[in-house]
A protein has these predicted regions:
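Post-signal peptide N-terminal regions of Sec-secreted extracellular proteins
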Residues: 30-142
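N-terminal prepro-regions of secreted/extracellular proteins
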Residues: 1-44, 49
């Protein structure tokens, strides 16, 4: 009986750990702002676009590196699909973060001083349907 209880306790502990890993990703210490998500420092917001009432896509720059974060304003705390995207024109290198998050997607960063970029993001409803998406094509070229 004692071995059965030990095995049952181990099974429950393992199941609880696995269940925790199945839930959507969320930063251990969620950033307090889009700039903080990019790492703070010399990053500053150079553009932003509202995703209806579901979130805002922020483009930040520090003199050499572009950083994009999609910040949720609806279903905050609920894991939903959120995307942040940036692509460099010179070689079409793209960086994307597209997962279920509770607060924001990103940061996605790319070095592109003096180069055009595509940047944007999207949010989804809890059902998985796209709530809002927006992308700016070949902009911020200087």
């Amino acid at each position: 009986m004692r071995k059965f209880k030990q095995k049952a306790a181990l099974t429950l502990t393992t199941a609880a750990m696995l269940a925790g890993s199945v839930f959507a990703s969320s930063p251990a210490n969620a950033a307090s702002s889009p700039i903080a998500a990019c790492g703070g420092g010399s990053y500053h917001v150079i553009d932003q676009h509202a995703l209806s009432s579901y979130g805002t896509v922020y483009l930040m720059y520090n003199g050499s590196t572009d950083c994009v974060v999609t910040w949720k304003t609806a279903y905050v705390g609920t894991p939903t699909e959120v995307q942040a995207f940036v692509e460099r024109e010179s070689d079409f290198k793209a960086v994307v973060d597209d997962k279920k998050y509770s607060y924001y997607a990103g940061p996605v960063k790319i070095d592109a001083p003096g180069m055009c970029i595509i940047w944007g993001g999207s949010t989804a409803l809890p059902s998985g349907a796209t709530a809002s998406a927006w992308y700016d094509y070949w902009s911020h070229c200087d």
